[in-house]
């Protein structure tokens, strides 16, 4: 048995039973763990989806050069999306061969770095353990004919490898590993099976089997290894690999270092004519070089608990063995990949014959960030969007000097997608050919068209005098919308829309909105995130203040027209918190169903006539109010989706402050606080196709007003977004209100069912509204409801019971209540 001395200890080299000593043909191994790179993608322009694909590793028997590997095997992690806000983001996992292999070899044997392989290694360009722990490509030539030759020997006899014919192709029926020390046959789940490239069912020549044995003998895993065949009755050959596992002295320290971006030194070849003294100096020189190397290396990201687990492994095992190092490698790489460091891999172990085990990791340091714009065909073009607009959306973890993390790529996808400027987004990490172990992050963007226009139409039917519709009663309506986005490449936009329910007589209810949005108010390079927005508008809505209570005849409707301008600034403190403040100036006109100005609400008389002596509709008493007021709101929303279910908390506080400018010099303070909490009742496994958790929703809302209060701004109770089971405003209109509610959501197949209970109360303030519309229209001022429902796509179908009258009804609503 050959041996050499390191630190005064004899280190055995592996031996094989073959007579061949040619080690010039070494196979290049690829790490199995690092080959699994997440691939985030979307398949449709609207809904992200998940697929899992696998690409088979290269089976070529020729050792590829590093440049060839980088060209052929460098596969990107693609992050694709669309301009629409995605509610969730999912991964595509591809089994890709990794090019992040270890650095240059460090010597011939079990000295510190093991760069070239322990026990007779030859110092190839890959890290010793990067090769040692990796499945090698199968040596069978897949391009060859599947024909094979029978062994031509009696069945069930053992044949030494050197006794096989060099002219035959042998079909391998099965492979077994036999541990000589334990005198047992190990199962296929054992990590040693990762080392073997031959496969059951494969066809191999004697030379290929000899090459396999030589590779195993020189990998450093085994002190002794042998390969023999056993003939089968069907002419195939069973292969048994018997081995004695390599071991080193016990260790009581563990160290993990990041060797990414470190220049790999090329060792000086040892002259076979060296004297023992020269060899000793040679090994000491290698040890010094390795010590300087690990001293220059950066500490890895591995946390203390994982260090503790590895130390426990070392204490429990005693001597350091190849299997133990594989377990350490698996545990270290599992932590990296669980934490999202998809490009990290263990490439080497050093100091194995000292009291310290050094684990070398290439973590995937980002060396460069590249942003590219592409046309529809994927050609690189000069984009309209200014690059700083994209850069400010990237998390710092995706910049040069940080370790690439899949979560940072996911966050970059979400942030860039929220700009609404791109139809497709890709975040591709690829190996840096100029920096060993480095990662170049490429961000590829396809821009949306800057200008767009849309026309939507709808038809309404107005009954004629006899109650039945006529041809003339069909009214075409709809809206026209246009948008010019990304002005000057700075994400500024101009949007406009015009809406009417009757294109034939648009003057009846024509509404419009023209809005300009100016982000990066403090400059695109300023980290402060403020957006200026201004708009002019004209809208019409039915007022729920003038609504009858239970048992009251139908109350003639009052429409509220608002026309004016608004300007505000929104400052995003974080992704979850924002603050908006601005000025609103508007003219409010109240009209009856004939579009005439109505200064008072109307009532139906017992005689069937209509009385116009109801509560005043405006503060001025003329049916027309003008006012200016400040408006501010702060929102904190940390909700998230868990398999499609909303979980978290949302809080909104809004204040409107009158300035005493306008009709009757209105001065008031109107404030609202809304709090909603979504409580996850059970932990569930997250992922595509997984069931969402049951959720308990708790909701509270308070609104109050001090000072002047026109009736159209009073708080109303009742309706699908107040207290369900009642019509809009059916419970009352008040100066102060309180609402509470609870809802439990239980997932069922592809949807969820829910049960709810809600209550609303005017806190005795209905009488303080001018004209007391609550009393005039015989409303109670408070009410409760309960019920259950099911979500059908975008529609809520629910049965709600009005607790005041004890009657129930079925409702169909769009959207969510909370």
UniProtKB/Swiss-Prot annotation:
Q: What does this protein do?
A: Essential protein. Mediates the insertion of proteins targeted to the outer membrane of chloroplasts. Required for the import of protein precursors into chloroplasts. Forms the voltage-dependent preprotein translocation channels (hydrophilic beta barrel) of the TOC complex in the chloroplastic outer membrane.
- What is the annotated quaternary arrangement, including any partners? Part of the TOC core complex that includes a protein for the specific recognition of transit peptides surrounded by a ring composed of four proteins forming translocation channels, and four to five GTP-binding proteins providing energy. This core complex can interact with components of the TIC complex to form a larger import complex. Chloroplastic protein precursors such as prSS (precursor of the RuBisCO small subunit) also interact with these complexes.
The induction field says: Up-regulated by CIA2 in leaves.
Name the record gives this protein? Protein TOC75-3, chloroplastic
List the Cytoplasmic topological domains: 483-509, 571-578, 703-714, 793-806
Tissue-specific expression: Mostly expressed in young and actively dividing photosynthetic tissues and, to a lower extent, in old leaves and roots. Particularly low levels in leaves after etiolation.
Q: What is the organism field in this record?
A: Arabidopsis thaliana (Mouse-ear cress)
Q: Which UniProt keywords apply?
A: Chloroplast, Membrane, Plastid, Plastid outer membrane, Protein transport, Transit peptide, Transmembrane, Transmembrane beta strand, Transport
